[in-house]
Amino acid sequence: MKILLSNDDGVHALGIKVLFDELVKHFSVNVVAPDRNCSGASNSLTLLNPLRAEHLDNGFISVNGTPTDSVHLGSSQLFTDCDLVVAGINKGANLGDDTLYSGTVAAATEGRHMGMPAVAVSLAGNNEQHYQTAAIVTAKIIKRLRTHPLPADQILNINVPDIPLAELKGIKVTRLGHRHQAERMQKMQDPWQRDIYWYGVLGQELDGGEGTDFHAIANGYASVTPLTVDMTAHRSIENIKSWLTALNLSD
């Protein structure tokens, strides 16, 4: 199996190096990742400037773009025979609503858009000490994907608690939880007394009960959430039809 490995923390981040070292024991792995930290980049693209790929001494390829750019360039030009896209290991969790903003999840999503199964993996914790735990869990899951391939419209979002492997209780298949709204943006001033603004702290869990990714992590389990690329709210189609078809555009 040939893997295209990317991330959103940047090509020099510890997480991608640890994951590469584990995956390369079992698979052929090529790394194409942003040249800088792109956390929160979501599915953004670089459209107004050309992309450049720089080959680094360790064999990784650095791209002056976003995580989505990196996967698109890697799979369409640099390594066109890849079988799987893996994104991570992200520094910090991607739980619940985080997935909407995550460059890690976006990199995996782009892999699916390019016709490949894809996996996003994040280390859930504040200390970032046990990347190896997440790397080993990811490698084991990928091995199972050989015989249990993902449906064409799905990716796997993996979150692993920041604990030693021996303390990990297991793996749970979960749904996304939800957060409370983030705190208000913080207004400050720069040295020239001009107003600047910083995003507030993420909201705490609003829906973090049993069965959610939040609950799994809080109880010492790795969380695996299948995500669909189709954002259609299928359950609402008939209801909206019922009142929208009566709309008279000539009124």
From Swiss-Prot:
Binds 1 divalent metal cation per subunit. A divalent metal cation binds at D8, D9, S39, N90. Pfam families: SurE. InterPro entries: SurE, SurE-like_Pase/nucleotidase, SurE-like_sf. One of its GO terms (molecular function) is exopolyphosphatase activity. GO terms for cellular component: cytoplasm. It catalyses: a ribonucleoside 5'-phosphate + H2O = a ribonucleoside + phosphate. Its EC number is 3.1.3.5. The keyword DNA damage does not apply. Keywords: Cytoplasm, Hydrolase, Metal-binding, Nucleotide-binding. It is found in: Cytoplasm. Its cofactor is a divalent metal cation. It is an enzyme of class 3 (hydrolase). Transmembrane segments: none annotated. Belongs to the SurE nucleotidase family. NCBIfam families: PRK00346.1-3, PRK00346.1-4, surE. Nucleotidase that shows phosphatase activity on nucleoside 5'-monophosphates. This is 5'-nucleotidase SurE. It comes from Colwellia psychrerythraea (strain 34H / ATCC BAA-681) (Vibrio psychroerythus). The gene is surE.
